[in-house]
Amino acid sequence: MITKESIENLSQRLNIVDIIENYIEVKKQGSSFVCICPFHADKNPSMHINPIKGFYHCFACKAGGDAFKFVMDYEKLSFADAVEKVASLSNFTLSYTKEKQENKKELKSILPSLNAYFKDNLKHHKEVLTYLYQRALNDKDIAKFELGFAGASEDSIRLLQNQKIPLEDAMSVGALKKDENNEFYASFIWRITFPIYDHKDLLVGFGGRTLNPNVPAKYVNSPQNILFDKSRIFYAFNIAKENIAKKKEIIVCEGYMDAIAFHKAGFNNAVAVLGTALTEHHLPLIRRYDAKVILCFDNDEAGLKAATRSAFLLSTNKIDGKVAILQGGKDPAELVAKNESTKLHNILDEGIELGEFYIRRLISTHSIISALDKQKALETIQKFTFNLEPLVANSYTSLVSNLLKVDEKFIVLSQNSKKTIQTPLISQNKYNFPKEKIHIAELELIAFLKQHPDICNDFKQISDSVCFKHKILLDKILEKKGYEDSDIREFESKNIRKNLNYSEFLLGICKVNLAFLNNVKIKNSTLALKKQLFTLIDKNLNLLIKNLNTAELNNFLKEYLSFLKYEKNEEILQQSFRNLNGIFGNKNFTAYDLGFSIQNNDEPF
């Protein structure tokens, strides 16, 4: 593992212009440099490079980042691989955490030895070969996907011992396990083996299928270990990646045999997940290939749930694609085995766009008989569409209108929708929040979260990243992304005050929440987002009682009450006033102390 200090030293010494010049012709323009952007069909130099700040930016496609990010995207490398490439181009010697690095290097040789044994062993088990032939596989398929067979546990252990491989090391890469008596046994016993490679063509684990109907677990994967993390890996990606790059499309299915079947049917860009659905850890790999995603899952409850979760994940992360559900209880392997590959082509062609699929699934979980039912369904949909780009969100207006049988004028799917840009929610609010101060305050709050990852859950309980202009950066901090992310590296290079205390942090979140409510212009006061924000602020008040002195709390409540004075939604008012009454009682001051009186109709109660 490369040390962070080594990466920082390399970052300070490298010249980003020199790095990019290794890939594209660069021309000087004033104090900066320009070049043709390699990340879109650029004809004029749209990419600008700032050698002082060490960042590039394309004004056409918005690609940008530091030298590491450029190499990652250009060569489709992981962060660690990109760092090594940049170091090589810069004649820089990186430092590694030696023990772990050397140990990992030794461990990488264990699984290939086992795989060679499994492949050879398959030849001696005709009953297993017969099963594979019955599943419409031939010798060419078996060789292409390196299928094998794991026999008795003692056979695998004997092989490892003969090759002088420490059994503890074999266990650390998932080849062995220990029983209740602390005795070693093989992870794969009497199973067909499917070797699993990562995106760098490193063998990191196996899948195994039993032919014994009495064994409850038909399929198993290698256990999680130093090499294998099933939430980050696709089966058959090593075979499919060239075609994924060419087609800019990836088919994601449920199992090993399904992925193999897709390849037999001519879909050489197919892979399989190793769990029930996609995870956020798969997204960087998909983005690296700029690929649209076709989800092809079974039409059972598990398949539909996996497709729904995956459609939400992809849509909200700006990845395009569609969902193709297999009907009739057949999976791709069955269709190919029965020479029905044409049906597979038709199923993929008739797939439903990701967002539309997710919205249809959401509505299917609601009764939409009464107007109130439809309002609740709409608010559920808004929780999804408010996470999308406005143009994308508004493209679903007609769909939602038709499904709910509600006029389009009542369908608001984007916070920035023209339908919502009317008069300000609070036109008389005298408390203005200077944009520059909010910008600085946000960065300070984000820096505090970066320093104290243990309070990320506190933040999620009392605010929402949608309130922040730096939403993408904040989400990355909340996801606990590290130095390998270019936005995090750029953020850490800024000179931001980082000596906040917890009470300042809480008060700062409240200020940002209120600033968002102050600036957003929402006609419909029952929108889910607005109700959610008021609820979050109310939750935050209880924390403020414990962490702010009376004067600080007094000042904040003045600003908060100025919003509530003009609120028309009874549900919001009742809940907020209940919370406020408790605060007034605890702090021994009243609404009158905050400048409100019945005589001038400013009394909030």
Swiss-Prot record:
It catalyses: ssDNA + n NTP = ssDNA/pppN(pN)n-1 hybrid + (n-1) diphosphate. The keyword Transcription applies. InterPro entries: DNA_primase_core_N_sf, DNA_primase_DnaG, DNA_primase_Znf_CHC2, DnaG_bac, DNAG_N, DnaG_primase, TOPRIM_DnaG_bac, TOPRIM_dom. Residues 248-329 form the Toprim domain. One of its GO terms (biological process) is DNA replication, synthesis of primer. Mg(2+) 2 binds at D298, D300. One of its GO terms (molecular function) is DNA binding. Transmembrane segments: none annotated. Keywords: DNA replication, DNA-binding, DNA-directed RNA polymerase, Magnesium, Metal-binding, Nucleotidyltransferase, Primosome, Transcription, Transferase, Zinc, Zinc-finger. Mg(2+) 1 binds at E254, D298. It is an enzyme of class 2 (transferase). SUPFAM superfamilies: DNA primase core, Zinc beta-ribbon. Its EC number is 2.7.7.101. Binds 1 zinc ion per monomer. CDD domains: TOPRIM_DnaG_primases. Its cofactor is Zn(2+); Mg(2+). Belongs to the DnaG primase family. Contains an N-terminal zinc-binding domain, a central core domain that contains the primase activity, and a C-terminal DnaB-binding domain. Monomer. Interacts with DnaB. This is DNA primase. It comes from Campylobacter jejuni subsp. jejuni serotype O:2 (strain ATCC 700819 / NCTC 11168). The lineage of its organism: Bacteria, Pseudomonadati, Campylobacterota, Epsilonproteobacteria, Campylobacterales.
